[in-house]
Amino acid sequence: MTAALHIGHLSKSFQNTPVLNDISLSLDPGEILFIIGASGCGKTTLLRCLAGFEQPDSGEISLSGKTIFSKNTNLPVRETTFGLPRTGRCSVPHLTVYRNIAYGLGNGKGRTAQERQRIEAMLELTGISELAGRYPHELSGGQQQRVALARALAPDPELILLDEPFSALDEQLRRQIREDMIAALRANGKSAVFVSHDREEALQYADRIAVMKQGRILQTASPHELYRQPADLDAVLFIGEGIVFPAALNADGTADCRLGRLPVQSGAPAGTRGTLLIRPEQFSLHPHSAPVVSIHAVVLKTTPKARYTEISLRAGQTVLTLNLPSAPTLSDGISAVLHLDGPALFFPGNTL
């Protein structure tokens, strides 16, 4: 199978400051990839290089087997087949929604029967058929998002690129537009690259996630693999919350840390030092011990919240704060037991 997108060893600097460093990625036909990372990590620059708005210093980019950038090739933007929705606004404010989508078809402008059929199909696909005669100033932000996607899909691009497409919308509208946009992309069989800083969004909607930090890709994997089998401590901390401790491995599949001796998931040899990570949801709090890994603790303070109970407790010399969706009624100062569900993760050499 020919990759919908292939990026090989791509690098880019601005004024001798590296922004992208040896980026390699591939995307299968119909696959949705989320690129996530903190602000300034290089994810938007990577998207601009893919779209042809920035020229990489080195590396190569190919689209469905066709090289569009390499040492000897640099196709103009007009000769590539990317769709890049200008999210949040229509590109031509004096044209109706219908004409804005027709604008995406290029020279045809929706004059032929085939072009009109394509425009009507995109209106229906994105749920805006009833808005066809309206003008941009008559649309809400969410409606303009749908128009932007319909216009980008109209010329049938091989790949859709989206840079923080939902960031300007309120939470309720963002959720609805996001689900509709993902559904439209999948219904149209399009590959897509989303740039996002929202890890929950990526975990829910991506086929694969690429985590970036300081111009490098730390790991590319499915959401499940990235969450359960992370290859890098920085990646796992960005993709989800974690409680970390310095630790040393033992020969029996455990590690010693400030919470005591805990089971770990690691293939490193005994004696290796590194960082142990526990997901907060692995903990549960009970009044008594049970035949599982138990850590004795003292409850310092419990604070009921809307959807969980915030509990501060001391385990040995360590003070932990956990947000537990359900917890027994415990008085401050009472002794309790933390149960650990499953092994902790261990990252050799990542000392705190």
Curated annotation (Swiss-Prot):
One of its GO terms (cellular component) is plasma membrane. Keywords: ATP-binding, Cell inner membrane, Cell membrane, Ion transport, Iron, Iron transport, Membrane, Nucleotide-binding, Translocase, Transport. Pfam families: ABC_tran, FbpC-like_RD, FbpC_C_terminal. The keyword Disulfide bond does not apply. InterPro entries: AAA+_ATPase, ABC_SmlMolc_Importer, ABC_transporter-like_ATP-bd, ABC_transporter-like_CS, ABC_transpr_FbpC, FbpC_C, FbpC_RD, P-loop_NTPase. Residues 5-239 form the ABC transporter domain. It is found in: Cell inner membrane. GO terms for molecular function: ABC-type ferric iron transporter activity; ATP binding; ATP hydrolysis activity. PROSITE patterns: ABC_TRANSPORTER_1, ABC_TRANSPORTER_2, FBPC. It comes from the Bacteria. The keyword Cytoplasm does not apply. Its main location: membrane. It catalyses: Fe(3+)(out) + ATP + H2O = Fe(3+)(in) + ADP + phosphate + H(+). It is a peripheral membrane protein. Its EC number is 7.2.2.7. Transmembrane segments: none annotated. ATP binds at G37, A38, S39, G40, C41, G42, K43, T44. Part of the ABC transporter complex FbpABC involved in Fe(3+) ions import. Responsible for energy coupling to the transport system. Belongs to the ABC transporter superfamily. Fe(3+) ion importer (TC 3.A.1.10) family. The complex is composed of two ATP-binding proteins (FbpC), two transmembrane proteins (FbpB) and a solute-binding protein (FbpA). PANTHER family: PUTRESCINE TRANSPORT ATP-BINDING PROTEIN POTG (PTHR42781:SF5), SPERMIDINE/PUTRESCINE IMPORT ATP-BINDING PROTEIN POTA (PTHR42781). This is Fe(3+) ions import ATP-binding protein FbpC.
